[in-house]
Amino acid sequence: MSSTMLDDVDNNMMGIKSISLYELLSDVVKQGDKTRLVTAGPEQVLPDLIRHITETIPFDLFINLKNEMNDARNLVTRLNWLGKFLNDNFLQNHTFPFTILRICELCYDPFKYYKINELEKFVNALEKCCMVTSSWQVFDKTHGEKQEDDKEKDINFIKNQEDVSLMKIPWMTENNTRELAPFIREIDSIMSVNLGYDDEDEEEGFFDGDEDREMGNKSKRNVLLKDENFMVEEYYEDDCGINDDNSDNKGQNCQSDVTKNNSDDEDDDDNDDDYREDGADEDDEDDDHMGSTDDDEDDDEDRQAGESTKVQNFDKKNETPRKRKPTDLDNFEYDESPSFTNMDLTTPKKYKHTATGRFSIIESPSSSLLNAMDGSNEISSSQEEEKEDAHENHEGRSEGLLPGDELVSPSMSSSQEDKMVAIAGITYRENISSPLGKKSR
Protein backbone atom coordinates (compact mmCIF):
# COMPACT_ATOMS: atom_id res chain seq x y z
CA MET A 1 0.00 0.00 0.00
CA SER A 2 1.37 3.37 -0.98
CA SER A 3 1.98 5.84 1.80
CA THR A 4 1.04 8.93 -0.18
CA MET A 5 0.50 11.85 2.21
CA LEU A 6 -1.80 14.75 1.47
CA ASP A 7 -1.08 18.26 2.69
CA ASP A 8 -4.62 19.51 2.09
CA VAL A 9 -6.88 17.05 3.84
CA ASP A 10 -10.37 16.74 2.39
CA ASN A 11 -13.25 17.16 4.83
CA ASN A 12 -14.82 13.87 3.69
CA MET A 13 -11.70 11.84 4.57
CA MET A 14 -12.43 11.99 8.32
CA GLY A 15 -9.01 13.59 8.93
CA ILE A 16 -7.12 10.64 7.43
CA LYS A 17 -4.11 11.84 5.42
CA SER A 18 -3.50 8.62 3.47
CA ILE A 19 -5.95 8.03 0.61
CA SER A 20 -5.31 4.28 0.49
CA LEU A 21 -5.87 3.95 4.26
CA TYR A 22 -9.09 5.99 4.01
CA GLU A 23 -10.46 3.77 1.23
CA LEU A 24 -9.52 0.57 3.08
CA LEU A 25 -11.07 1.70 6.38
CA SER A 26 -14.26 2.91 4.67
CA ASP A 27 -14.69 -0.45 2.90
CA VAL A 28 -14.07 -2.44 6.08
CA VAL A 29 -16.22 -0.29 8.40
CA LYS A 30 -19.11 0.78 6.14
CA GLN A 31 -19.42 -2.18 3.79
CA GLY A 32 -17.97 -4.88 6.07
CA ASP A 33 -15.54 -6.09 3.39
CA LYS A 34 -12.93 -8.11 5.26
CA THR A 35 -11.22 -9.29 2.11
CA ARG A 36 -9.50 -5.91 1.78
CA LEU A 37 -7.44 -6.70 4.88
CA VAL A 38 -6.54 -10.15 3.56
CA THR A 39 -5.52 -8.92 0.13
CA ALA A 40 -3.56 -5.92 1.44
CA GLY A 41 -1.81 -7.77 4.25
CA PRO A 42 -0.32 -6.49 7.51
CA GLU A 43 2.79 -5.09 5.75
CA GLN A 44 0.71 -2.50 3.84
CA VAL A 45 -2.02 -1.71 6.38
CA LEU A 46 -0.28 -1.53 9.76
CA PRO A 47 2.41 1.13 8.95
CA ASP A 48 -0.17 3.74 7.82
CA LEU A 49 -2.51 2.77 10.65
CA ILE A 50 0.25 3.20 13.29
CA ARG A 51 1.20 6.61 11.85
CA HIS A 52 -2.45 7.70 11.94
CA ILE A 53 -2.75 6.62 15.60
CA THR A 54 0.45 8.29 16.84
CA GLU A 55 0.50 11.54 14.82
CA THR A 56 -2.82 12.51 13.21
CA ILE A 57 -5.31 11.61 15.94
CA PRO A 58 -3.69 13.35 18.97
CA PHE A 59 -2.51 16.52 17.20
CA ASP A 60 -4.98 17.10 14.34
CA LEU A 61 -8.30 15.61 15.50
CA PHE A 62 -8.60 15.86 19.28
CA ILE A 63 -8.05 18.99 21.37
CA ASN A 64 -7.35 19.08 25.09
CA LEU A 65 -8.56 22.40 26.45
CA LYS A 66 -9.34 21.22 29.98
CA ASN A 67 -6.24 19.07 30.44
CA GLU A 68 -2.84 20.43 31.37
CA MET A 69 0.26 20.01 29.25
CA ASN A 70 1.51 17.18 31.42
CA ASP A 71 -1.66 15.20 30.83
CA ALA A 72 -1.50 15.81 27.06
CA ARG A 73 2.11 14.65 26.92
CA ASN A 74 1.20 11.57 28.91
CA LEU A 75 -1.55 10.67 26.41
CA VAL A 76 0.80 11.16 23.44
CA THR A 77 3.44 8.90 24.98
CA ARG A 78 0.80 6.23 25.60
CA LEU A 79 -0.23 6.34 21.92
CA ASN A 80 3.42 6.09 20.81
CA TRP A 81 3.86 3.07 23.04
CA LEU A 82 0.78 1.42 21.45
CA GLY A 83 2.23 1.99 17.98
CA LYS A 84 5.49 0.36 19.04
CA PHE A 85 3.59 -2.59 20.55
CA LEU A 86 1.70 -3.20 17.27
CA ASN A 87 4.90 -2.99 15.29
CA ASP A 88 6.85 -5.43 17.46
CA ASN A 89 4.15 -8.04 18.13
CA PHE A 90 2.11 -8.12 14.91
CA LEU A 91 3.84 -6.30 12.05
CA GLN A 92 7.06 -8.22 12.56
CA ASN A 93 5.09 -11.49 12.69
CA HIS A 94 3.07 -10.60 9.58
CA THR A 95 -0.27 -10.91 11.36
CA PHE A 96 -3.14 -8.72 12.49
CA PRO A 97 -4.39 -8.58 16.08
CA PHE A 98 -7.71 -10.37 16.45
CA THR A 99 -9.29 -7.00 17.37
CA ILE A 100 -8.30 -5.38 14.08
CA LEU A 101 -11.93 -4.73 13.10
CA ARG A 102 -12.62 -2.71 16.26
CA ILE A 103 -9.33 -0.81 15.80
CA CYS A 104 -10.41 0.13 12.28
CA GLU A 105 -13.77 1.43 13.57
CA LEU A 106 -12.14 3.62 16.23
CA CYS A 107 -9.54 5.04 13.85
CA TYR A 108 -11.98 5.69 11.00
CA ASP A 109 -14.54 7.77 12.97
CA PRO A 110 -13.44 8.42 16.57
CA PHE A 111 -16.01 11.22 17.04
CA LYS A 112 -18.82 8.73 16.61
CA TYR A 113 -18.02 7.36 20.07
CA TYR A 114 -16.21 10.22 21.83
CA LYS A 115 -16.30 14.01 21.96
CA ILE A 116 -13.59 16.24 20.54
CA ASN A 117 -12.08 16.89 23.99
CA GLU A 118 -12.21 13.26 25.21
CA LEU A 119 -8.81 12.07 24.01
CA GLU A 120 -8.15 10.26 27.26
CA LYS A 121 -11.25 8.07 26.82
CA PHE A 122 -10.20 7.30 23.26
CA VAL A 123 -6.72 6.25 24.39
CA ASN A 124 -8.17 3.98 27.08
CA ALA A 125 -10.43 2.23 24.56
CA LEU A 126 -7.61 1.85 22.03
CA GLU A 127 -5.30 0.31 24.64
CA LYS A 128 -7.89 -2.37 25.43
CA CYS A 129 -8.09 -3.27 21.73
CA CYS A 130 -4.34 -3.22 20.96
CA MET A 131 -2.93 -4.86 24.09
CA VAL A 132 -3.64 -8.42 22.94
CA THR A 133 -1.54 -11.39 21.93
CA SER A 134 -3.91 -13.41 19.75
CA SER A 135 -3.74 -12.97 16.01
CA TRP A 136 -6.53 -12.63 13.50
CA GLN A 137 -6.86 -15.68 11.16
CA VAL A 138 -9.13 -16.28 8.23
CA PHE A 139 -9.90 -19.96 7.78
CA ASP A 140 -9.74 -20.12 4.04
CA LYS A 141 -8.71 -23.46 2.63
CA THR A 142 -6.30 -23.77 -0.24
CA HIS A 143 -6.95 -25.78 -3.37
CA GLY A 144 -5.02 -28.83 -2.14
CA GLU A 145 -6.91 -28.94 1.18
CA LYS A 146 -10.23 -28.80 -0.65
CA GLN A 147 -9.29 -31.80 -2.81
CA GLU A 148 -8.32 -33.85 0.25
CA ASP A 149 -11.59 -32.97 1.96
CA ASP A 150 -13.52 -34.11 -1.08
CA LYS A 151 -11.78 -37.50 -1.05
CA GLU A 152 -12.41 -38.09 2.62
CA LYS A 153 -15.80 -38.92 4.03
CA ASP A 154 -17.04 -35.70 5.48
CA ILE A 155 -19.76 -35.87 8.10
CA ASN A 156 -21.06 -32.53 6.92
CA PHE A 157 -22.64 -34.25 3.92
CA ILE A 158 -25.73 -35.39 5.73
CA LYS A 159 -29.36 -34.87 5.11
CA ASN A 160 -30.01 -32.83 8.21
CA GLN A 161 -27.68 -29.85 7.89
CA GLU A 162 -29.42 -28.03 10.77
CA ASP A 163 -28.01 -30.43 13.38
CA VAL A 164 -25.02 -28.54 14.84
CA SER A 165 -23.76 -31.60 16.71
CA LEU A 166 -22.84 -33.27 13.43
CA MET A 167 -20.92 -30.30 12.06
CA LYS A 168 -17.19 -30.81 11.71
CA ILE A 169 -14.97 -28.70 13.93
CA PRO A 170 -12.64 -26.69 11.68
CA TRP A 171 -9.57 -26.70 13.97
CA MET A 172 -9.66 -30.49 14.46
CA THR A 173 -6.95 -32.28 12.46
CA GLU A 174 -6.69 -35.94 11.47
CA ASN A 175 -4.28 -36.75 14.28
CA ASN A 176 -6.66 -35.31 16.84
CA THR A 177 -9.58 -37.30 15.48
CA ARG A 178 -7.50 -40.52 15.57
CA GLU A 179 -6.62 -39.91 19.19
CA LEU A 180 -10.23 -39.26 20.08
CA ALA A 181 -11.56 -42.34 18.28
CA PRO A 182 -11.18 -44.85 21.19
CA PHE A 183 -12.61 -42.35 23.66
CA ILE A 184 -15.63 -41.78 21.44
CA ARG A 185 -16.15 -45.55 21.08
CA GLU A 186 -16.24 -46.02 24.84
CA ILE A 187 -18.78 -43.22 25.18
CA ASP A 188 -20.93 -44.73 22.43
CA SER A 189 -20.87 -48.19 24.03
CA ILE A 190 -21.90 -46.82 27.41
CA MET A 191 -24.66 -44.69 25.98
CA SER A 192 -25.96 -47.47 23.72
CA VAL A 193 -26.13 -49.97 26.60
CA ASN A 194 -28.03 -47.59 28.85
CA LEU A 195 -30.34 -46.43 26.13
CA GLY A 196 -30.95 -50.00 24.99
CA TYR A 197 -32.19 -51.18 28.38
CA ASP A 198 -34.35 -48.12 28.80
CA ASP A 199 -35.89 -48.53 25.37
CA GLU A 200 -36.68 -52.23 25.94
CA ASP A 201 -38.31 -51.53 29.30
CA GLU A 202 -40.36 -48.72 27.88
CA GLU A 203 -41.46 -50.82 24.90
CA GLU A 204 -42.49 -53.80 27.07
CA GLY A 205 -44.31 -51.62 29.55
CA PHE A 206 -45.95 -49.70 26.77
CA PHE A 207 -47.34 -52.81 25.07
CA ASP A 208 -48.37 -54.52 28.30
CA GLY A 209 -50.06 -51.46 29.62
CA ASP A 210 -51.90 -50.83 26.40
CA GLU A 211 -53.11 -54.40 26.19
CA ASP A 212 -54.33 -54.38 29.78
CA ARG A 213 -56.02 -51.04 29.31
CA GLU A 214 -57.68 -52.13 26.10
CA MET A 215 -59.00 -55.33 27.69
CA GLY A 216 -60.30 -53.43 30.70
CA ASN A 217 -62.00 -50.85 28.51
CA LYS A 218 -63.62 -53.56 26.39
CA SER A 219 -65.01 -55.34 29.44
CA LYS A 220 -66.40 -52.08 30.82
CA ARG A 221 -67.99 -51.27 27.50
CA ASN A 222 -69.66 -54.68 27.35
CA VAL A 223 -71.08 -54.27 30.83
CA LEU A 224 -72.39 -50.83 29.97
CA LEU A 225 -73.93 -52.06 26.74
CA LYS A 226 -75.72 -54.92 28.52
CA ASP A 227 -77.05 -52.76 31.34
CA GLU A 228 -77.48 -49.61 29.31
CA ASN A 229 -81.24 -49.78 28.87
CA PHE A 230 -81.86 -50.75 32.45
CA MET A 231 -79.57 -48.08 33.87
CA VAL A 232 -81.01 -45.32 31.69
CA GLU A 233 -84.61 -46.26 32.48
CA GLU A 234 -83.91 -46.45 36.18
CA TYR A 235 -82.15 -43.10 36.10
CA TYR A 236 -84.97 -41.33 34.30
CA GLU A 237 -87.65 -43.01 36.44
CA ASP A 238 -85.96 -41.80 39.61
CA ASP A 239 -85.45 -38.39 38.15
CA CYS A 240 -89.06 -38.13 36.99
CA GLY A 241 -90.41 -39.24 40.35
CA ILE A 242 -88.29 -36.71 42.14
CA ASN A 243 -89.34 -34.00 39.75
CA ASP A 244 -93.03 -34.87 40.14
CA ASP A 245 -92.81 -34.79 43.91
CA ASN A 246 -90.97 -31.51 43.78
CA SER A 247 -93.52 -30.02 41.39
CA ASP A 248 -96.43 -31.11 43.63
CA ASN A 249 -94.79 -29.62 46.68
CA LYS A 250 -94.07 -26.41 44.80
CA GLY A 251 -97.70 -26.17 43.62
CA GLN A 252 -99.03 -26.59 47.15
CA ASN A 253 -96.60 -24.02 48.47
CA CYS A 254 -97.60 -21.56 45.74
CA GLN A 255 -101.30 -21.98 46.52
CA SER A 256 -100.74 -21.40 50.23
CA ASP A 257 -98.63 -18.34 49.43
CA VAL A 258 -101.37 -16.94 47.16
CA THR A 259 -104.03 -17.33 49.85
CA LYS A 260 -101.78 -15.67 52.42
CA ASN A 261 -101.07 -12.79 50.08
CA ASN A 262 -104.79 -12.28 49.36
CA SER A 263 -105.62 -12.15 53.07
CA ASP A 264 -102.79 -9.69 53.65
CA ASP A 265 -104.05 -7.48 50.80
CA GLU A 266 -107.55 -7.41 52.28
CA ASP A 267 -106.17 -6.37 55.67
CA ASP A 268 -104.13 -3.66 53.99
CA ASP A 269 -107.24 -2.34 52.19
CA ASP A 270 -109.13 -2.13 55.49
CA ASN A 271 -106.28 -0.24 57.06
CA ASP A 272 -106.20 2.13 54.08
CA ASP A 273 -109.93 2.92 54.49
CA ASP A 274 -109.44 3.65 58.17
CA TYR A 275 -106.53 5.87 57.32
CA ARG A 276 -108.58 7.76 54.76
CA GLU A 277 -111.45 8.30 57.21
CA ASP A 278 -109.07 9.54 59.87
CA GLY A 279 -107.43 11.80 57.30
CA ALA A 280 -110.82 13.26 56.33
CA ASP A 281 -111.62 14.04 59.97
CA GLU A 282 -108.26 15.70 60.39
CA ASP A 283 -108.89 17.78 57.25
CA ASP A 284 -112.20 18.99 58.67
CA GLU A 285 -110.51 19.99 61.91
CA ASP A 286 -107.79 21.79 59.97
CA ASP A 287 -110.44 23.70 58.00
CA ASP A 288 -112.16 24.78 61.22
CA HIS A 289 -108.89 25.85 62.68
CA MET A 290 -107.98 27.77 59.52
CA GLY A 291 -111.35 29.54 59.64
CA SER A 292 -110.71 30.67 63.22
CA THR A 293 -107.23 31.87 62.32
CA ASP A 294 -108.65 33.84 59.39
CA ASP A 295 -111.05 35.63 61.73
CA ASP A 296 -108.20 36.44 64.08
CA GLU A 297 -106.17 37.81 61.20
CA ASP A 298 -109.09 40.06 60.15
CA ASP A 299 -109.32 41.43 63.69
CA ASP A 300 -105.61 42.10 63.74
CA GLU A 301 -105.80 43.94 60.43
CA ASP A 302 -108.64 46.13 61.71
CA ARG A 303 -106.70 46.90 64.86
CA GLN A 304 -103.58 47.81 62.89
CA ALA A 305 -105.59 50.09 60.58
CA GLY A 306 -106.97 51.92 63.61
CA GLU A 307 -103.51 52.32 65.04
CA SER A 308 -102.22 53.74 61.75
CA THR A 309 -104.94 56.40 61.73
CA LYS A 310 -104.17 57.11 65.36
CA VAL A 311 -100.55 57.75 64.50
CA GLN A 312 -101.56 60.30 61.85
CA ASN A 313 -103.87 62.25 64.19
CA PHE A 314 -101.32 62.73 66.95
CA ASP A 315 -100.25 66.22 67.88
CA LYS A 316 -96.96 67.54 66.73
CA LYS A 317 -95.69 67.59 70.29
CA ASN A 318 -93.18 64.86 69.65
CA GLU A 319 -90.37 63.93 71.90
CA THR A 320 -86.78 63.59 70.79
CA PRO A 321 -86.07 60.29 69.02
CA ARG A 322 -84.41 57.37 70.69
CA LYS A 323 -80.71 56.91 70.86
CA ARG A 324 -80.06 55.53 67.42
CA LYS A 325 -77.66 53.16 65.83
CA PRO A 326 -75.72 54.19 62.70
CA THR A 327 -78.03 52.08 60.53
CA ASP A 328 -81.30 53.63 61.79
CA LEU A 329 -83.32 56.29 59.96
CA ASP A 330 -83.50 59.90 61.09
CA ASN A 331 -86.64 61.74 62.20
CA PHE A 332 -86.18 65.51 62.31
CA GLU A 333 -89.77 66.36 63.30
CA TYR A 334 -88.77 68.35 66.38
CA ASP A 335 -91.23 70.08 68.67
CA GLU A 336 -91.26 73.87 68.36
CA SER A 337 -93.71 74.57 71.21
CA PRO A 338 -92.45 77.03 73.88
CA SER A 339 -93.36 74.80 76.80
CA PHE A 340 -90.90 72.08 77.78
CA THR A 341 -91.34 69.61 80.54
CA ASN A 342 -88.83 67.58 82.40
CA MET A 343 -89.63 64.66 80.17
CA ASP A 344 -88.36 66.60 77.15
CA LEU A 345 -84.89 66.76 78.59
CA THR A 346 -84.49 63.06 79.31
CA THR A 347 -82.48 60.57 77.33
CA PRO A 348 -84.21 59.44 74.12
CA LYS A 349 -86.12 56.20 74.35
CA LYS A 350 -85.37 53.09 72.40
CA TYR A 351 -88.10 51.14 70.65
CA LYS A 352 -88.01 47.38 70.71
CA HIS A 353 -89.75 45.20 68.14
CA THR A 354 -91.95 42.73 70.01
CA ALA A 355 -93.18 39.31 68.91
CA THR A 356 -96.65 40.71 68.15
CA GLY A 357 -95.30 42.94 65.39
CA ARG A 358 -95.46 46.15 67.49
CA PHE A 359 -92.82 48.33 69.12
CA SER A 360 -92.37 48.58 72.85
CA ILE A 361 -90.49 51.36 74.59
CA ILE A 362 -87.36 50.59 76.58
CA GLU A 363 -86.83 53.47 78.97
CA SER A 364 -83.45 54.77 79.97
CA PRO A 365 -82.47 54.94 83.66
CA SER A 366 -82.70 58.77 83.71
CA SER A 367 -86.34 58.80 82.65
CA SER A 368 -87.47 55.86 84.78
CA LEU A 369 -88.05 58.04 87.87
CA LEU A 370 -90.07 60.61 85.96
CA ASN A 371 -92.18 57.91 84.37
CA ALA A 372 -92.89 56.38 87.78
CA MET A 373 -94.12 59.74 89.09
CA ASP A 374 -96.39 60.28 86.13
CA GLY A 375 -97.70 56.71 86.08
CA SER A 376 -101.05 57.61 87.57
CA ASN A 377 -101.60 60.41 85.05
CA GLU A 378 -100.75 58.11 82.13
CA ILE A 379 -103.22 55.43 83.26
CA SER A 380 -106.12 57.89 83.28
CA SER A 381 -105.09 59.45 80.00
CA SER A 382 -104.65 56.05 78.33
CA GLN A 383 -108.25 55.09 79.20
CA GLU A 384 -109.58 58.30 77.65
CA GLU A 385 -107.42 57.79 74.57
CA GLU A 386 -108.74 54.29 74.04
CA LYS A 387 -112.30 55.61 73.87
CA GLU A 388 -111.24 58.27 71.39
CA ASP A 389 -109.27 55.70 69.37
CA ALA A 390 -112.36 53.55 68.81
CA HIS A 391 -114.21 56.53 67.35
CA GLU A 392 -111.21 57.66 65.29
CA ASN A 393 -110.59 54.17 63.91
CA HIS A 394 -114.06 54.13 62.36
CA GLU A 395 -113.46 57.54 60.77
CA GLY A 396 -109.94 56.61 59.62
CA ARG A 397 -111.18 53.59 57.66
CA SER A 398 -113.60 55.75 55.67
CA GLU A 399 -111.20 58.60 55.03
CA GLY A 400 -108.03 56.60 54.27
CA LEU A 401 -104.57 58.06 53.84
CA LEU A 402 -103.70 60.86 51.48
CA PRO A 403 -100.60 60.47 49.28
CA GLY A 404 -99.07 63.63 50.74
CA ASP A 405 -99.49 62.68 54.40
CA GLU A 406 -96.38 62.45 56.52
CA LEU A 407 -95.65 59.90 59.22
CA VAL A 408 -94.89 61.32 62.65
CA SER A 409 -93.14 59.53 65.52
CA PRO A 410 -95.35 58.94 68.61
CA SER A 411 -95.15 61.14 71.72
CA MET A 412 -93.93 60.04 75.10
CA SER A 413 -97.53 59.84 76.43
CA SER A 414 -98.60 57.38 73.75
CA SER A 415 -99.11 53.73 74.50
CA GLN A 416 -96.41 51.15 73.99
CA GLU A 417 -98.33 49.60 71.12
CA ASP A 418 -97.65 52.53 68.75
CA LYS A 419 -95.97 51.51 65.53
CA MET A 420 -92.95 53.17 63.92
CA VAL A 421 -93.16 53.69 60.17
CA ALA A 422 -90.18 54.14 57.87
CA ILE A 423 -89.70 57.67 56.63
CA ALA A 424 -87.83 56.79 53.44
CA GLY A 425 -89.20 58.61 50.40
CA ILE A 426 -90.84 61.48 52.40
CA THR A 427 -90.09 65.03 51.28
CA TYR A 428 -89.09 67.25 54.15
CA ARG A 429 -91.04 70.41 53.32
CA GLU A 430 -91.52 71.77 56.80
CA ASN A 431 -88.08 70.93 58.22
CA ILE A 432 -85.85 73.49 56.63
CA SER A 433 -83.22 73.05 59.33
CA SER A 434 -82.84 69.32 58.60
CA PRO A 435 -79.55 68.25 56.99
CA LEU A 436 -81.47 65.89 54.72
CA GLY A 437 -83.89 68.65 53.72
CA LYS A 438 -81.11 70.61 52.09
CA LYS A 439 -80.00 67.62 50.09
CA SER A 440 -81.40 67.35 46.56
CA ARG A 441 -83.54 64.25 46.36
Curated annotation (Swiss-Prot):
Compartment(s) where it occurs, according to its Swiss-Prot or TrEMBL record: Nucleus
PTM-bearing positions, type Phosphothreonine: T347
Region annotated Disordered, chain positions: 201-220, 242-348, 364-418
Protein's UniProt keywords contain Nucleus: yes
GO molecular function: protein phosphatase regulator activity
Segments of skewed composition (Basic and acidic residues): 388-398
Domain of life: Eukaryota
GO biological process terms on file: meiotic recombination checkpoint signaling; negative regulation of DNA damage checkpoint
GO cellular component, one term: nucleus
Acidic residues: bias regions: 201-213, 264-302
Polar residues composition bias: residue spans: 249-261
Keywords: Nucleus, Phosphoprotein
Purpose: Regulatory subunit of the histone H2A phosphatase complex, which dephosphorylates H2AS128ph (gamma-H2A) that has been displaced from sites of DNA lesions in the double-stranded DNA break repair process. Dephosphorylation is necessary for efficient recovery from the DNA damage checkpoint.
Family per record: Belongs to the PPP4R2 family.
Record's subunit section: Regulatory subunit (R2) of the histone H2A phosphatase complex (HTP-C) consisting of PPH3, PSY2 and PSY4. Interacts with SPT4 and SPT5.
Leftover remarks: Present with 1010 molecules/cell in log phase SD medium.
Protein name, UniProt field: Serine/threonine-protein phosphatase 4 regulatory subunit 2
Organism annotation: Saccharomyces cerevisiae (strain ATCC 204508 / S288c) (Baker's yeast)
Gene (UniProt): PSY4
